[in-house]
């Protein structure tokens, strides 16, 4: 489906501004927002066949996100620019770089390109576009976004068109800033707290003592000989090794619905919550499969590390299932989310036994009853700080 774009015969941005402050500002999805914004502009006579809205982010992997509307297909093309993108030819010398460095609008007639023009211009010109306008969107702390418009009208953008777009940009800025702050908060919460915990904080679970009782499959893992490694390796190499370890474990657990709740030095506390989306058996199988996958990935990773003369990585995993307190604890002005309870303690003690029993993955009796993978009984064992002895199990071929 395509959208018919009118010739520039004079138009007013007021209907679009009215929409922005009524329905538009309530749209939480940026793709839908850009699509509806484009439709509103076309409906009031703006001569555009392409609209792009880009927003800078604070994310360890992504520098900016953008959504591009194209009239010929009436569709949205999303894009996430990795931090490395800023060092590529795609960005260097581009109108986007010019805009973000000067914080001034960029205008270029695409039917009058100079020799050696950047690919961002020539590709649009090859598609029949005649004019390009990029407007900076300023936030309270500086430049945070940009609105980019292109047309195929033979005469390009008129002075009236550009002034109307400038007026619209001024009304658009506070709405995009609020949207950016909301999603920035969500991104930072997910990055530093995890998705489940971040959502709880944003939903208002922020007072000390706020807690839920949840049922979950639990994972506790710990690197072998980490103290020795920190004493003998340069700090930079230790950090690189930790990040490599955390990355492949994260990939294994998040693929199956697990959430890294805490990094504790070289240890990881991970939960597979049992809820409407994941029953008890499913959660336990997911936790075990994640542990097996992580250990499998470790084998190939260590093969590479040996070739490069780097120390191998080794870690144990304790798995358990039970009821835990998932809550907000700490000092009045410094809080943290954590999981507490006897089930958590036993999970950590199971991991400690992986060293003495020579198995990389150990789990409790109740956990063994809920998994589909055959397990081996390794006897009753004492656990530090826990009365009596506890049954310990392992995967048959571990």
Predicted regions and their residues:
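Short beta-strand-to-loop transition segments that serve as allosteric relay/switch motifs
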Residues: 138-139, 146-156, 275
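Cytosolic regulatory/linker segments at or just downstream of nucleotide-handling modules
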Residues: 347, 353-398
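Regulatory cytosolic signal-relay segments
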Residues: 160-213
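Short hydrophobic beta-strand micro-motif common in sensory/regulatory domains
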Residues: 130-138
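Catalytic NTP-binding/metal-coordinating core of nucleotidyl cyclase/transferase enzymes
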Residues: 205-289
